[in-house]
Amino acid sequence: MRVAVTGASGFCGGHVARAAAAAGHAVVGLGRRPGPVGEHRFWDAAAAGPDLSGVDLVVHCAAAVGDPAPGRRAEAAMRAVNVDGTARLLRAAAGRPVVWVSSASVYDPRRGRGLVTEDHPRANHLNAYGRTKAAGEALALAAGAVVLRPRAVYGPGDTQLLPRLLSRVRGGTLLLPGPDVELSLTAVENLADACLAAPGWAPGAYNVADGAPYARDAAVAAVLRAHGSGARIRRLPLPVAVAVARAAESAARLTGTEPALSRYAVDQLAHPVVLDLSRARAQGWTPRRTLEDYLSSRPA
């Protein structure tokens, strides 16, 4: 089978491309830069439709990610890729099966997320990323795609989640907002496995994460130790964290830079978010990797 992977030069797309090649599939990497394996076809998601000639399956990993300064510029930049780029891809797919990698950031943060099913409301997003991913996946679902919703993807090559966390250490201390909570995380290998299994699933949305949630403070402490950091974890009262985030976002609006702290970042760490994996498990998918596996496999 010939599998097109968009965003193959990126973190998630690169893992999907390598996994597809390892499974014996011919890989076509779509993006501005070549991926780690297979044929490269240039594609700028914000400008034109992709060349899908000869392709049997499309796995759409390309996305504008991050937590930019609030405002029209960030909204437009993310919409150009996550929404308009999705529309271009779906038109080019012309009925081919599509696996669309979304995010648990589409879920409404104002509702309880102690156990989140795929039917959880998708509204009240805290940044442009959540809003545009929700709008993009709505197009994909309407087109009959399989949509995967991972949360907090980590693993080899991660440039977002753990690097951002480690960069927040100051004076030997890492401040975390609010109390200790349970959080779902997603090993990139588990996501890649789901991407390659998903073509056999019924169209619709599926949560994807590691097999069990993690206690936040213990997981963060393990990450710090594995990276040689002796930083201590201290808890910042949630109202204080939210107030600081609001002030940082206001400053970022003026400078056009990413806020030092955002309400989205606070929300991701301060409230329990556990994904219900029942729907994906019912399809025969089982997550095989854990945070401990990743941390123990890192070079000393």
Regions found by a protein language model. Name each.
Residues 124-146:
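Active-site Tyr-X1-5-Lys
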Residues 159-164, 177-199, 203-207:
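Substrate-positioning beta->alpha
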Residues 3-23:
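N-terminal Rossmann NAD(P)H-binding glycine-rich loop of SDR-like oxidoreductase domains
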Residues 194-259, 296-299:
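Mid/C-terminal beta-alpha module of Rossmann-like enzyme folds, strongest
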Residues 87-128:
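Conserved Rossmann-fold NAD(P)-dependent oxidoreductase catalytic core, especially the SDR/UDP-sugar
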Residues 275-300:
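Amphipathic terminal alpha-helices
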Residues 35, 43-84, 88, 92, ...:
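NAD(P)H-binding glycine-rich loop region in Rossmannoid oxidoreductase-like domains
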Residues 146-164:
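Flexible, glycine-rich beta-alpha linker
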